[in-house]
């Protein structure tokens, strides 16, 4: 009997436990592998001591991926390890970092599909002991990616979403019903703009929030001082990163960079929110001072961003005017153009005749000189 049980257990390990064995081997391999610069950056961006995502760090990671300074595969692998970890804080921050990289880096979606990050997210969703907010957040991302028409070239996203929808339809409907009542800083940032920021994928929840809310005053005035401080911190991180990119030497076309444009749009969206904080804050002078100072910095950076384009337009206008002034002089008529040609021909003929005459005269003089030297008389010459 013991041998039969051992044989049965062996068969179970070969079939049902094959996937678990691969997961264990991958985790052991990751543990034995030396930490890379990419993994260190992900560790720093997903520290358990962070209460909110470090958007400055997240955007810096995206910029370094786009500049090929970081290996996108290593970043995705490090995020995958954090999602499969046990820390709810690290899981939440990893999901936010994953979304930021996917929105701002073209190649990240392919890495997410090839590194089987979706499997870890599905495991997180189905894990009843995991944090409920993290499970919802993972499902939101899979749903948005699965419904996106831009990701049809990667069928794994749609297949994973449909698999979850079929297995747990009640969970999906329950979440859709619960989402409209929630109000987050991310949804508030999207309200002033009728379209999602460039480079982002369509998120149904954001579109629904845009349709239900008419302005910024809906729930923004009820934000606590803590929420206002968080909004100020998020905006400041984006502004600092944008300022550093605009002031980077050796990049004359930085205004055309996709990440720069995305950060600029985020700062534009944040400016009315900061102004609302200024108007609604009456009980905390510290928050009011920070909001006023940040608003001044936003206006300065936004105005400096527009200057290169205006300078280029003025330069092109001046160049057109200068080129136009050169061509405004009167053009010679066809008759005037032909007259110099005729005159030149006449002058050439005259010069030719003079040259021939002078040459004949020179020949005669030479003959006369020869005769004188020989002592020939003029009479003999006449004979």
UniProtKB/Swiss-Prot annotation:
Residue stretches of biased makeup (Basic and acidic residues): 306-316, 339-354
SMART domains recorded: VHS
Tissue expression: Ubiquitously expressed.
GO cellular component, as recorded: cytoplasm; membrane
The keyword Glycosyltransferase belongs to this UniProt entry's keyword annotation: no
Matching InterPro entries: ENTH_VHS (IPR008942), GAT_dom (IPR004152), GAT_sf (IPR038425), TOL_plant (IPR044836), VHS_dom (IPR002014)
Biological processes per GO annotation: protein transport to vacuole involved in ubiquitin-dependent protein catabolic process via the multivesicular body sorting pathway
Predominant subcellular localization, coarse grouping: cytoplasm
Keyword Phosphoprotein found: yes
GO molecular function, one term: ubiquitin binding
Residues in VHS domain copies: 45-178
Region entry Disordered, spans: 305-383
Function field: Binds ubiquitin in vitro. Might contribute to the loading of the ESCRT machinery.
Protein name (database record): TOM1-like protein 2
């Amino acid at each position: 009997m013991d041998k039969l049980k051992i044989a049965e257990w062996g068969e179970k390990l070969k079939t049902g436990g094959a996937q678990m064995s691969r997961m264990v081997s991958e985790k052991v391999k990751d543990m034995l592998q030396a930490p890379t610069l990419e993994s260190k950056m992900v560790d720093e961006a997903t520290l358990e001591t962070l209460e909110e995502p470090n958007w400055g760090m997240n955007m810096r990671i995206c910029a370094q991926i786009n500049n090929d300074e970081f290996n996108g595969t290593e970043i995705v692998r490090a995020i995958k390890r954090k999602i499969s970890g046990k820390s709810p804080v690290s899981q939440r921050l990893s999901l936010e970092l994953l979304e930021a990289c996917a929105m701002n880096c073209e190649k990240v979606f392919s890495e997410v599909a090839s590194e089987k990050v979706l499997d870890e997210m599905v495991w997180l969703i189905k894990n009843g002991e995991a944090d409920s907010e993290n499970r919802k957040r993972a499902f939101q991302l899979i749903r948005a990616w699965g419904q996106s028409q831009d990701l049809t070239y990667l069928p794994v996203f749609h297949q994973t979403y449909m698999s979850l929808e079929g297995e747990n339809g009640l969970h999906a409907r329950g979440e859709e019903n619960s989402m409209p009542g929630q109000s987050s800083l991310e949804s508030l940032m999207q309200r002033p703009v009728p379209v999602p920021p460039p480079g982002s994928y369509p998120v149904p929840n954001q579109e629904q929030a845009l349709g239900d809310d008419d302005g910024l005053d809906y729930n923004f005035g009820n934000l606590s001082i803590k929420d206002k401080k968080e909004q100020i911190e998020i905006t400041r991180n984006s502004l600092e990163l944008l300022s550093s990119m605009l002031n980077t030497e050796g990049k004359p076309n930085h205004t055309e960079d996709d990440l720069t444009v995305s950060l600029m749009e985020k700062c534009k969206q944040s400016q009315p929110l900061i102004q609302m904080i200024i108007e609604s804050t009456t009980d905390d002078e510290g928050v009011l001072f920070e909001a006023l100072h940040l608003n001044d910095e936003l206006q300065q950076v936004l105005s400096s961003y527009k200057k290169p384009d205006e300078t280029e337009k003025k330069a092109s206008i001046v160049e057109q005017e200068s080129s136009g002034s050169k061509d405004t002089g009167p053009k010679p008529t066809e008759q005037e153009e032909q007259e110099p040609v005729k005159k030149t021909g006449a002058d050439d003929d005259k010069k030719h005749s003079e040259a021939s005459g002078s040459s004949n005269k020179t020949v005669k003089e030479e003959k006369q000189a020869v005769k004188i030297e020989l002592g020939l008389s003029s009479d003999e010459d006449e004979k």
